[in-house]
A protein has these predicted regions:
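Bacterial N-terminal signal peptides that target proteins for export
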Residues: 1-9
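Beta-propeller folds
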Residues: 24-252
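Bacterial N-terminal signal peptides
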Residues: 9-18
Length: 252
């Protein structure tokens, strides 16, 4: 009985000591505000390259790094969009990456529906000789960003944007979706959001196939589906705000 009591006491003391050590460690406030060092990791279509966004220092902007997938120890290609900040990217082909970027241009909202950031985009063309790799600005990629690539049509991507007036202010938060040719800079409207349907997603041929909505009368989010050769949207799922079930679409 004495041995049992001694063992229990020893375990309690060890637990208290370890708890004191953990509670005694102080983290500076900056640590809690840090963004993820590495994000957006993805592989090129041919599996030969790995790209990611990496933050090298606490207050630094993300840098796009491209590695040789067969030799990750090899020095990667690095690129930033200074003075802009890369926020997302997509592989278009084995040697082309499109990305969207933002830049803080004002300290407070200036006018109706005008934020502190301005948005743009670019396309990076990789070369076997990293010094010959280059990128150019895609002015049509704005706040709505890049929605999807189109692997069957490598010169095209789907982008979205918000209608603006002559002063540059956003008039509506219902996005317009365009099929954008990255070679010629031309774009064609595919569809527009409505008050009922937003976050439209597309298939490999740029056909609108799914969307999201919300019905306040029944306090539920709605999932919409549209067949490939149809213009009719159908509700395939209603989910009340009190329902925490998770689900996702696998394909079309």
């Amino acid at each position: 009985m004495t041995n049992l009591f001694r063992n229990i006491s020893f375990i309690i003391i060890l637990t208290l000591m370890s708890s004191t050590q953990v509670l005694g460690k102080v983290y500076p406030i900056e640590e809690w505000a840090k963004r993820a060092d590495i994000s957006e990791v993805s592989m090129s279509p041919d599996g030969e390259k790995v790209a990611m966004l990496r933050i090298m220092e606490i207050e630094g902007n993300p840098i796009l790094e491209v590695y040789d997938a067969n030799n990750l120890g090899k020095r990667p290609f690095r690129m930033d969009a200074d003075p802009m900040e890369i926020v997302q990217f997509y592989w278009v082909t084995d040697d082309k990456i499109v990305f969207s970027a933002r830049q803080k241009v004002r300290d407070k909202i200036d006018g109706f529906n005008r934020g502190v950031y301005e948005y743009s985009g670019g396309i990076l063309t990789l070369d076997r000789n990293p010094k010959k790799s280059s990128w150019k600005k895609l002015t049509s990629v704005g706040r709505g960003g890049i929605v999807s690539t189109l692997p069957k049509y490598p010169d095209n991507i789907i982008i979205s944007g918000y209608p603006r007036n002559s002063r540059g202010n956003i008039e509506s938060y219902s996005r317009v979706y365009h099929n954008y040719n990255i070679k010629t800079g031309t774009k064609k409207i595919i569809t527009r959001e409505s008050s009922n349907r937003r976050n439209i997603r597309f298939d490999e041929d740029a056909n609108p196939r799914s969307a999201r909505g919300y019905d306040g009368a029944i306090n539920s989010s709605l999932a919409y589906y549209r067949a490939k050769d149809s213009s009719e949207w159908k509700i395939i799922k209603e989910q009340n705000r009190a329902d925490f079930e998770t689900w996702r679409r696998i394909g079309y």
